[in-house]
Amino acid sequence: MGCLCINLKKKVKKPTPDISGEQNTEVKSREITPKEQPRQRQPAPRAKFQIVVQPHKLPLPLPQPQEKQKLINHQKQSTLQQPEPILGRPFEDIKEKYSLGRELGRGQFGITYICTEISSGKNFACKSILKRKLIRTKDREDVRREIQIMHYLSGQPNIVEIKGAYEDRQSVHLVMELCEGGELFDKITKRGHYSEKAAAEIIRSVVKVVQICHFMGVIHRDLKPENFLLSSKDEASSMLKATDFGVSVFIEEGKVYEDIVGSAYYVAPEVLKRNYGKAIDIWSAGVILYILLCGNPPFWAETDKGIFEEILRGEIDFESEPWPSISESAKDLVRNMLKYDPKKRFTAAQVLEHPWIREGGEASDKPIDSAVLSRMKQLRAMNKLKKLAFKFIAQNLKEEELKGLKTMFANMDTDKSGTITYDELKSGLEKLGSRLTETEVKQLLEDADVDGNGTIDYIEFISATMNRFRVEREDNLFKAFQHFDKDNSGFISRQELETAMKEYNMGDDIMIKEIISEVDADNDGSINYQEFCNMMKSCSQSHQSKLVQPN
């Protein structure tokens, strides 16, 4: 079977939502109801955490001037001290044991690097979590529990191995097995052909992880393709491994779980009803299987609120292409994994016993419609180039276009530092009449914080709110296009796109190819002005931020 040619112009019945993590943002321990969900969001670091230590009470009688000055100096030093260790042991300098290398990726709480063990020369992955971004006590508890669960599950074949955890004054560092093969989505979209059999192999590994977790008394609570990595670049020997146990919990007998966690497209209906158990992991795996077979999630909308409404409605499409050509056995498994009633939903053992998923089972080698691959490639990163374009336009809007937003920024930036912290954003939104929850405010800050430093600077604020000022105006779009078209050729070449994106650490070679594939409608290998405008105008409302939309 040869490589399939992906027809990017082929019309599909509904728009392809972005579930790559750019618009489908991970929801960490959200304390909100489905009706209160914010609009599309992008994962980004959390708010700046300011540590305040209460001053010591002065003893009676009052000290002499010299003693008083010593006490004041001691108080100043106390305010600079960090909170008590999260791991409950003395701080360690990780650089004494490991040398940190290039960045592998960024998440809500920190950055993952490649690191080398000094004593052995072996490479590992180091997930460095910035403690100032752990705003709530619950955030700190989640980190402790993540480490406990990873140690507890250590040695299981389809789970990323943790080597150790270290803590210094600024960060908690998790040193883990290095998975050099990349994310599950990359494996799917790179294949020369894609079949039901390939989908069965992938979902079998996913459900084996679920089975191990449930057998050992753990609910993952955030299963999605981005949280599965390939152990090596050699496809023949590579294993699929689960990672990111940041919202996972130990199963407690008789406990009803109520907090809404996970990622929008993969959330089970009982999570939204705040009454769930381990069956939610099977639902999430069922969503992954649905995507593997057709390229779209079973429940989609332009906003998280809309997605949740579709999930609660529970109607699954098996009529649109390519479902008529998918085997009945595959559809039967999907239906049983996505049973609305968790009591009727398959267990992990039942899934693995299904004839379609078993090794040597009914899953066919027949290639799935190439449009599925095309859609799945679109799920990866479409907004990367658009994000840079918005930033450029924000930097170049006229003064009169920015007056209102400039005043709003100044009013929120109460300490006149030139940046807005979490507390300033929360206070400013309350003054505007906003009724957003604490979690939603944090998410807004993360969405706008492009450089990941935990605060919003002026340009980031304008980028997040400026669509009210007609960002799609022709002159702004043309200037943005010229900014990327360095040689004035009338096209944005692959090299020009690569230069622009790598300047902001916003994309690797695969990502750049995918953006060109998606935007380049005439398939000439570059992006012309009309293609650029079409990209900027598509789903433009999804960029709108609640920063300027009080409820």
Curated annotation (Swiss-Prot):
This is Calcium-dependent protein kinase 19. It is an enzyme of class 2 (transferase). Ca(2+) 3 binds at D485, D487, S489, E496. Its EC number is 2.7.11.1. It catalyses: L-seryl-[protein] + ATP = O-phospho-L-seryl-[protein] + ADP + H(+); L-threonyl-[protein] + ATP = O-phospho-L-threonyl-[protein] + ADP + H(+). It comes from Arabidopsis thaliana (Mouse-ear cress). The lineage of its organism: Eukaryota, Viridiplantae, Streptophyta, Embryophyta, Tracheophyta. Ca(2+) 2 binds at D449, D451, N453, T455, E460. GO terms for molecular function: ATP binding; calcium ion binding; protein serine kinase activity; protein serine/threonine kinase activity. The active site is at D222 (proton acceptor).
